[in-house]
Amino acid sequence: YQEDNFSRYYAASIVRGREHDPFVAKGGSAEETRDTKKMEDKASKLKDFTVAEARPLPVIVMADVSGSMTVDGKIEALNLALKDMVAGFAAESRLRAEIQVGLITFGGERARVHLPLAPAHKISEVSPLRADGRTPMGAAFEEARKLIEDKDMIPSRAYRPVLVLVSDGLPTDDWEQPLDGLCKSERGQKATRFAMAIGADADVEMLRRFANDPESPVFKAHEARDIHRFFRAVTMSVTSRSRSTAPNSSAPLVLADIPEDDDLDLDF
């Protein structure tokens, strides 16, 4: 009698448990229910480990290619420095930030986009710069402003851009209003802005108005090797940001850590 009552009680408990199992109520077994829940738990955990897409970190260089850059190997040193910088960026990990590079040149009568903004690891070659003519720097500022404010080229999720200005002379066009327009634009005022004055004829005061990092004042290049050292420092600053847990924080130029190149020893 006791055994019979226990059997009936146990059977009733099982039935009640099955009635409250939504999967079993629809015709599935308890074992199938457990397997389904395990699969759902695994899928949920996989979602937690999904790797986020790297955010763009734009680097835009404005390079002087006026006629004076042909003197003393300046343009050759600049070409080599840009090539090495892009290669350095391309070798970086893209887990958090994807470094992108664009190049605007100004020389002759106009400024133009020499290298459209693109991920560094997808840039197969930077065609050599050729120097000639005047120094339309104001036009370069306007090109840079249009580029950094273009939400199709640089999406809202991008990290703050880096702007680099390199010149060996005085602007030959109207430049003050375009410079203010660039530096006061929504993204321009948040950007990290580095500047290099090449030789004794560069407009250092104008370059100071462009540069905005108190820890990285206008760098003065007195010889060809200095151009290379400056761009190595830019490379280190940007890659440091890309590896950081906070890539929107600027990293100053540290030229003390950059070795001098004995094969680039032309004085300007």
Segments the model singles out, each with a brief description of its role:
Residues 200-249:
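Von Willebrand factor A/integrin I-like adhesion domains
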Residues 97-127, 204-212:
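Short beta-strand-loop
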Residues 57, 189-192, 213-216:
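Short glycine-/polar-rich loops that comprise or flank the Walker A/P-loop
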Residues 17, 23-60, 65-76, 149-156:
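Acidic, polar low-complexity linker/tail segments
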Residues 52-114, 122-159, 162-166, 173-174, 192-205, ...:
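Von Willebrand factor
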